[in-house]
Amino acid sequence: MRAVVLALLTVLLAACTQVPLAEPPPVAPEPTAQPEPSELVVGVEDLGAGFNPHLLAHSSSLTTAVAALVLPSVFRPGPDGVPQLDRTIATSAEVVSTEPFTVSYELNLEASWSTNTPIAAEDFVYLWEQMRADAGVADAAGYRLITDVRSRAGGKAVDVVFDEPYPAWQGLFSDLLPAHLLKDAPGSWIGATTGGLPASGGPFRIATVDAGRGEVVLARNDTYWDTPAVLDTLVLRRLDDAAMATGLAAGDVDVALSEADPAIRTALGGLSPVPRTQLAPLPTVTQLGLRSVDGPLRDARARQGLAALLDREAIRLSVAPEALPADAFGLAPSEPGYAASAPDGAPARPDPIAAEQLLRSAGWARDASGNWTVDGQPVALVIGSAAERPEDGRVARLVAAQLTVAGIDTTAVESPAAELFVQGSAPATEITATTAPATTSSAAPATSSAAPTTAPPPGGGVAVDVIVGPRTVGGAPGTELASDYGCALPTAVVPDPPSTPTGFCFPALQLLLESLAAGSGEDDPARFATAERVLWMQLPALPLFQPVGLVVSSAAADAATGIAPGPLTEGPLAGAARWNEPAR
């Protein structure tokens, strides 16, 4: 009986016990919207031939802009153009000895490449070795005064020793390159930088280079040790004038960097509201390098006579009407202190009578048909331009057309920039289009329907007599004169130095150029005037013009960036690390 009662109680208790309810499934969190990466689009005319700012072959406004954002420099130009120490790279840089002249650099311990390799003494050594011994580089004279680069403190301190005092030393070791990646790279520093830069030491890095689409994407360098860039990406997109205007109107393009010319101004004139435009001179002077080492122009009188046949102003007005006429070998027209040094007449101005006299005094003569000959053979000049520089090609065609009218057989050829500016030679690829130049002077006929000689020279290559190309400006004037027009003299460090592509060397001028390079660049105007006068007599090159760019920006881009032309040697994108994304 007791067992039955216990069994009943157990059943009743079980019936009264509350069965727990199943817990509801967990509520999935609401997805949070990820912000779109911030981006700013810059329209550019061309991507250029490469990204090495030390090579004439890679010289372009885009190369200058990218280098300022990606490559480390010990000194950068301040608002007044005076070099200022970039403490993100070096905490100090000073002259520590005058005998021998020695500069000591203490590098920022945090400064490193995007590969996490420290920015160190080996990068100084690499740039010095390349600049002193390679052809086709810009402003090498200062590096050729260096006798040693010594490393201390595990590579974070550098002592640079010179063979003589060099007051312009602050202009050296800008745009350092990653030695650990380039020193053994195939194609050396030319081939390895043609399609980009392998590492960054600045606030941005090159993320992609798509030559087919015409686009370079800079991304924030997440390994940068200092204040990071505000923007996630900066897109540099190749566009023609019409596409730039359309993109600005639609808001697809925020800033445009174009050549200043009537075509872009016409395209922009149809926009409402009209975007803001600012002129931005480029850090180059377009010139005609005249081959003096051999060939028909080896005599200075022949070079002067050739120049007296050309209408430089007609060429400028036809190719780059807003460019600044360049009438000096040193400072560019946009630089403080510039003064024209060109003589009033030939060879700076067209003068057919003077040209005839100069050419005859150099041994030239006219044949029965009126064409020029030398050494009993018809004069046949090759006018070369870089295939990657279309404006230079237009100059080459105009020069060829003017000389053809004057009775000189000419052939205009294109060459890869690396070949033209290093070797002074070109393959026999004819520029077939011919444009008659505008005429501004009745003294030298400049319009003609005659085309240059169409038959290419025999063989796989040809020495170029007239090289259309850039001369870099913006550095120490004495250094630039010595770099561009000095003799390639052997030293204990560089026993076989490269010459310029034209091979120019005038020993009587060499000591003066060396003294100007070793001076402050501003302390002796009379010596600079003497150098200019001799250069106009010897004429290693004929200056044409300083190209001028146009910085175009929408109101929204202005508010977000405060864009300006920037320092001459860095350009309008110099402050892009601080830019914000424009309001859309």
Q: Language-model segments: what does each one mean?
A:
Residues S174-A229, T233, P352, Q357:
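Gly/Pro-rich hinge or "lid" segments in bacterial periplasmic/extracellular proteins
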Residues N221-A267, D409:
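Ligand-site clamp/hinge motif
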Residues A365-A438, A443, A450-P470:
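Ligand/substrate-recognition segments at binding pockets and active sites
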Residues R298-A401, R584:
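Append "and occasionally in soluble cytosolic enzymes with long acidic Gly/Pro-rich linkers
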Residues E106, A140-P186:
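Surface-exposed binding/hinge segments that line
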Residues G43-T98, E129, A199:
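N-terminal lobe/hinge region of extracytoplasmic solute-binding protein
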Residues V551-R584:
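Long beta-strand-rich cores associated with HINT superfamily self-processing modules
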Residues A33, R316, T411-E414, A418-L420, ...:
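Extracytoplasmic/peripheral linker and loop segments enriched in polar/acidic and small residues
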